[in-house]
Structures are given as C-alpha cells and as structure tokens.
C-alpha cells in the first residue's frame, strides 16, 4: 500500500507521486506517516521532509507551511521547498555564513527574529545536502 504525496509552493509543484512513507517536521516535532494514518491537519515547521520511495529515501528542505493527511493522501502547502539534489552546496554554505553574520549584527527584536528565521532556513538547506552525502 502507498501514499499519494503532493508538495506545493507558491511558485511550483515540488512533488506529486506515490510514496511508501514520509517523515515530516511539524511545529510540535517530527511525525512519521505510513499508509492508513489517522486524518490530521498540522502546521509544518522549517525542517526536512524525508520521503521513502521503494528502495531509497529522498530529502526535501521545507520552509514551513501546512500539511493535510487523509485517506492516504498527503498535501503539503509549503512556504518554500527544495529537493536536496537541486541545492547548490557552495551557495547553501555561503547563505548560511551570511545568515550567521546577519544574526550577530541584528539590532532590535524584529531584525533578530528575521535573522533567526533566515538562519534556520539556511541550516535546513545545508542539512538537506549533508543527508545526501552520508
């Protein structure tokens, strides 16, 4: 038995295919979803989406959003998402370094919050790449 997973962002469809299982980062922690999972609607946190295909795992860097699971259908509406193999490692590392520098230079609460979110997004992209190479 399989699940149908659809991952959408404001710009494009990232994924629309059958999968065996997913591991999703939510605001209350990670959840694993197998066929016949109980229906749920949840906020999606900035983090990794792990997708199990027949014999391998695929990783997606998710930038937050919303997920709905019902009747073996999973729909994720993401603020942004990138499949790990599409991420340029050098660019991701540079973005992480810039985000770290911006956080240390942040003045005021708003700048600190924005810099912290940018840092979380950058770390997620780098983490997605590391999953490929390990």
Curated annotation (Swiss-Prot):
SUPFAM superfamilies: Epsilon subunit of F1F0-ATP synthase N-terminal domain (SSF51344). Its main location: plastid. One of its GO terms (molecular function) is ATP binding. One of its GO terms (cellular component) is proton-transporting ATP synthase complex. Keywords: ATP synthesis, CF(1), Chloroplast, Hydrogen ion transport, Ion transport, Membrane, Plastid, Thylakoid, Transport. Transmembrane segments: none annotated. The keyword Zinc does not apply. InterPro entries: ATP_synth_F1_dsu/esu (IPR001469), ATP_synth_F1_dsu/esu_N (IPR020546), ATP_synth_F1_esu_C (IPR020547), ATPsynth_dsu/esu_N (IPR036771). Gene3D superfamilies: 6.10.140.480, F0F1 ATP synthase delta/epsilon subunit, N-terminal (2.60.15.10). Pfam families: ATP-synt_DE (PF00401), ATP-synt_DE_N (PF02823). Coiled coil: none annotated. Belongs to the ATPase epsilon chain family. F-type ATPases have 2 components, CF(1) - the catalytic core - and CF(0) - the membrane proton channel. CF(1) has five subunits: alpha(3), beta(3), gamma(1), delta(1), epsilon(1). CF(0) has three main subunits: a, b and c. This is ATP synthase epsilon chain, chloroplastic. The gene is atpE.
